Amino acid sequence: MVAVGSTLPKVTLWENKPEEVVEFPSQGKFIIVGVPGAFTPPCSSQVPGYIANEKQFAAKGISGIYVVAVNDVFVTKAWKKSFDGGEQSGVHFVADWNGEFTKAFDAGFDASGLLGPLRSKRYAAVVENGKVVKVFIENEVTDVDISSADKVLSSL
């Protein structure tokens, strides 16, 4: 599982459209929020905290927030639009359409019967200069506690 000291996998991720490839910053501090699936109730309750607290995160040195879901880019774009302020927000909604990032980050689980075979565990990771420096992993993927925006923000 993703852990402190982990480096980011070198895989292709997308935002907004298939031609828009996402590259995580190699320098500075940012947050990756791993979610099992766009539009699911727990995920849709977790993400607004990151959008609402974007300025507070920036004040603590966070240069970006990247919500990564094992969904296609059209789904993640629509999900971003579904949030009040989502379109104006600087929070990135990133598609890991084939789960390659999730697998390489060792953050996947089998969600067969509900969401499909591979989904991401729910976590938040603070990354600094390409390495994970803090990680917040939920014990159950339906929980939104340990990886909530408030908990991550208070740890910075």
Curated annotation (Swiss-Prot):
GO biological process: cell redox homeostasis; cellular response to oxidative stress; hydrogen peroxide catabolic process; protein refolding
Active site per the UniProt annotation: C43
InterPro entries: PRX5-like (IPR037944), Redoxin (IPR013740), Thioredoxin-like_sf (IPR036249), Thioredoxin_domain (IPR013766)
One GO cellular component term noted in the UniProt record for this chain: cytoplasm
UniProt keyword Oxidoreductase present: yes
PANTHER family in the cross-refs: PEROXIREDOXIN, PEROXISOMAL MEMBRANE ASSOCIATED PROTEIN 20
Pfam families xrefs: Redoxin
Further comment found in the protein's record: The active site is a conserved redox-active cysteine residue, the peroxidatic cysteine (C(P)), which makes the nucleophilic attack on the peroxide substrate. The peroxide oxidizes the C(P)-SH to cysteine sulfenic acid (C(P)-SOH), which then reacts with another cysteine residue, the resolving cysteine (C(R)), to form a disulfide bridge. The disulfide is subsequently reduced by an appropriate electron donor to complete the catalytic cycle. In the typical 2-Cys Prx5 family, C(R) is provided by the other dimeric subunit to form an intersubunit disulfide. Pmp20 lacks the resolving cysteine residue.
Keywords for this protein: Antioxidant, Cytoplasm, Disulfide bond, Nucleus, Oxidoreductase, Peroxidase, Redox-active center
Subunit-structure text: Homodimer; disulfide-linked, upon oxidation.
Any one GO MF annotation of this record: unfolded protein binding
Domain Thioredoxin: 2-156
Gene name for this UniProt entry: pmp20
Cited function: May act as a chaperone rather than a peroxidase. Has no thioredoxin-dependent peroxidase activity. Shows weak chaperone activity.
Family according to the record: Belongs to the peroxiredoxin family. Prx5 subfamily.
Protein name, entry field: Peroxisomal membrane associated protein 20
Keyword Disulfide bond in annotation: yes
Compartments where found: Cytoplasm; Nucleus
